[in-house]
């Protein structure tokens, strides 16, 4: 865990001082996460340095066996790149979808509708290492809770509006979870009773059909050919082409503001952390907040803080692997009888 540096003698009696340095590569892990239609993986050390990366495009029509093979092919090359002498802590996965953490299964993901009850135990056996799972937003929020100590007090709502729409919530530093795996499905709640559009999830009138990037892309592409569907690439295109001034985005913003207001009225978090390429446009951000305040109790407005994160925020890399590092350190540091 540590190694000795230079010996320094200050001229006084006694043993000379020896500098001790942290061995940053003592423990490494792999984080796997989703960006639009891509699966990405990174090998990182306990300090958080990314040592190697891998990426693959995935089909929305893939099935359980396809996902298992893709994950093994994505992760194994990174395991082989661990530094000499390093211990491998395991793999942290952060996906969009519903997880049963007791059975260690991905129950359903709108992005991969053909996958049902995917077993992460099987993946763990294939990789011969520990595998931990979480939703993308849970992992991001866990990272924020580690990096921002004041988030540990009161309620924190993390809301994502991008290719899809979702949310997660923490109270006093603890992320709220559900044993069956269904919780905070913000993108799959109807905000317009007249909307009868069928969503990818199978429901009718979901918020995502009105505001998610995947639903807006066909109409945007009619006016702006070449609009990217990759969320990281979309932000620059969106800002440079001033898409936020169009009626399509303003309508979507109203729908998202109503969703946020409903969650706020139920949870009353002290802070609302926003992760969205759409809200990087200052005019759209201001419009969203005005719509939000119109739909929430005036006496609560002084109690909420809005915080914007850059859409490229990759906190899930660290949030999904923190427990792996903790587990490995405990094994090394606790004396075994």
Segments (PLM) and residue ranges:
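ATP-binding/phosphotransfer module of carbohydrate and carboxylate kinases, centering on a glycine-rich
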Residues: 2-55, 62-80, 84, 207-337
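Short glycine-aspartate micro-motif
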Residues: 29-33, 88-92, 156-160, 166-168
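Glycine-rich phosphate-binding loop and adjoining helix at the ATP-binding site
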Residues: 58-60, 64-155, 283-295
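Short glycine-rich anion-binding loops that position phosphate/pyrophosphate groups of nucleotides
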Residues: 96-98, 162-164, 278-279
């Amino acid at each position: 865990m540590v190694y000795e540096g230079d010996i320094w003698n200050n001229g006084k009696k006694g043993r000379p001082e020896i500098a001790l340095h942290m061995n940053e590569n003592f423990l490494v892990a792999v984080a796997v996460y989703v960006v639009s239609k891509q699966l990405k993986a990174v090998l990182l050390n306990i300090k958080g340095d990314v040592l190697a990366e891998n990426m693959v495009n995935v089909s929305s029509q893939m099935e359980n066996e396809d996902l298992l093979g893709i994950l093994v092919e994505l992760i194994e090359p990174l395991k082989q790149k661990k530094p000499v002498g390093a211990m491998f802590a395991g793999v942290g996965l952060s996906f969009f979808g519903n997880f049963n953490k007791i059975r260690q299964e991905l129950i359903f993901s709108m992005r991969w509708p053909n996958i049902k009850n995917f077993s992460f135990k099987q993946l763990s056996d294939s990789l011969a290492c520990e595998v931990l799972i979480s939703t993308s937003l849970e992992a991001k929020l866990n990272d924020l809770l580690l990096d921002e100590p004041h988030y540990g007090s009161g309620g924190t709502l993390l809301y994502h509006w991008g290719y899809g729409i979702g949310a997660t919530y923490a109270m006093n530093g603890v992320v709220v979870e559900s044993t069956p795996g269904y919780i905070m499905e913000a993108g799959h709640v109807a905000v317009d009773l007249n909307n009868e559009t069928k969503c990818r999830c199978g429901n009718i009138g979901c918020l995502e059909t009105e505001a998610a990037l995947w639903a807006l892309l066909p109409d945007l592409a009619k006016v702006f050919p070449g609009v990217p569907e990759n969320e990281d690439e979309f932000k620059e295109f969106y800002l440079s082409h001033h898409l936020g001034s169009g009626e399509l985005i303003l309508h979507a913003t109203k729908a998202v503001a109503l969703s946020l207001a409903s969650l706020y009225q139920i949870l009353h978090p002290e802070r609302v952390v926003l992760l969205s390429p759409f809200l990087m446009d200052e005019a759209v951000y201001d419009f969203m907040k005005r719509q939000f305040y119109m739909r929430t109790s005036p006496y609560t407005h002084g109690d909420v803080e809005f915080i914007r994160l850059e859409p490229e925020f990759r906190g899930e890399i660290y949030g999904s692997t923190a427990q792996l590092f903790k587990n490995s350190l405990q094994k090394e540091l606790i004396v075994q009888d």
